[in-house]
């Protein structure tokens, strides 16, 4: 593909890294995937990469560092590993897109604040619940100040691996913080539920926002619908279950009108099953961020020429 693309690599050959590989091969013309690196030589992800003609290595970060032309690295390993990776990638001048809870860079939600961080050396994608719900809280807060936002993400138990289960506390804290610093809520709260139902359910989210003052429901509804359309550009399975609901509630801050939104996310089925919308929205968001970063790097290259 030559000078018209940015060379990228994926760190982590598990479910997330493998699904992201399929997404990168399936879409943006701005990126060229040149390496999938893991640490398990027998992993299915590395075998699939080789079968698809993508260079694969079990040497982890060392394999990435051996390629001086790789400019963007997607890290789908673990928070502990990313702490080390972030330092090495920064020192070698590469942009890191972090899919772990490490948060060594600013939180990014593509339709909300991505453009503010185009030159950041490291960005973090928060959590699956954050990627699904923060856009909707922001859609409310850009119309009227939000005093409190609460989200409940329910995901299929089968889609939650050991990493998710070990990091439940981190999920709730990080997502709640994202509701505040990106979503615009004065106070945020997040809850995750692992549903063991068979057959597995799609990812479902309930978003509850309590505006500070009186507001125009039509403006809030229009803002939410516009935001859903934006997210659907890169997550086609992202959809409202019902129109937003507006009703009066007794709250710690007095009787106020509240906004409730019910949302589900169906995965694209590239590698992960379609019920794993919670994982799919992370890889889809990563692809979106990578595409925008790559186009930004290409535009700077053109200016330099």
Swiss-Prot record:
NAD(+) binds at residues 13-16, 159-167, 278. SUPFAM superfamilies: Glyceraldehyde-3-phosphate dehydrogenase-like, C-terminal domain, NAD(P)-binding Rossmann-fold domains. It comes from the Bacteria. It holds the Pfam family AcetDehyd-dimer. It catalyses: acetaldehyde + NAD(+) + CoA = acetyl-CoA + NADH + H(+). InterPro entries: Acetaldehyde_dehydrogenase (IPR003361), Acetylaldehyde_DH_C (IPR015426), NAD(P)-bd_dom_sf (IPR036291), Semialdehyde_DH_NAD-bd (IPR000534). Its EC number is 1.2.1.10. GO terms for biological process: catabolic process. SMART domains: Semialdhyde_dh. It is an enzyme of class 1 (oxidoreductase). This is Acetaldehyde dehydrogenase.
């Amino acid at each position: 593909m030559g000078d018209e693309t940015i060379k990228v690599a994926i760190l982590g050959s598990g479910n997330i890294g493998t699904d992201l590989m399929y997404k990168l091969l399936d879409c943006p013309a701005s990126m060229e995937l040149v390496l999938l690196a893991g640490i398990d030589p027998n992993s299915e992800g590395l075998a699939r990469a080789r079968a698809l003609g993508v260079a694969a290595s079990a040497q982890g970060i060392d394999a990435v560092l051996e390629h001086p032309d790789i400019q963007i690295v997607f890290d789908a390993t673990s928070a502990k590993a990313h702490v080390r990776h972030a330092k090495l990638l920064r020192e070698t001048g590469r942009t890191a897109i972090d899919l772990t809870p490490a948060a060594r860079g600013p939180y990014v939600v593509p339709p909300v604040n991505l453009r503010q961080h185009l030159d950041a050396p490291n960005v973090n994608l928060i959590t699956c619940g954050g990627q699904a719900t923060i856009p909707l809280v922001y859609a409310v807060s850009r119309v009227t100040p939000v005093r409190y936002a609460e989200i409940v993400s329910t995901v299929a138990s089968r889609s939650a691996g050991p990493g998710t289960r070990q990091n439940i506390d981190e999920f709730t804290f990080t997502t709640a913080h994202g509701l505040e610093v990106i979503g615009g809520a004065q106070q945020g709260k997040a809850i995750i539920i692992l549903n063991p139902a068979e057959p597995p359910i799609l990812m479902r989210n309930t978003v509850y926002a309590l505006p500070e003052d009186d507001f125009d429901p039509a403006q809030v509804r229009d803002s939410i619908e516009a935001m859903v359309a934006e997210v659907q550009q890169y997550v086609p399975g992202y959809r409202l279950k019902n129109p937003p609901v507006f009703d009066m509630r007794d709250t710690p801050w007095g009787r106020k009108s509240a906004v409730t939104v019910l949302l589900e996310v169906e995965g694209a089925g590239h590698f992960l099953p379609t019920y794993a919308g919670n994982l799919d929205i992370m890889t889809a968001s990563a692809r979106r961020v990578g595409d925008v970063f790559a186009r930004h790097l290409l535009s700077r290259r053109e200016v330099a020429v």
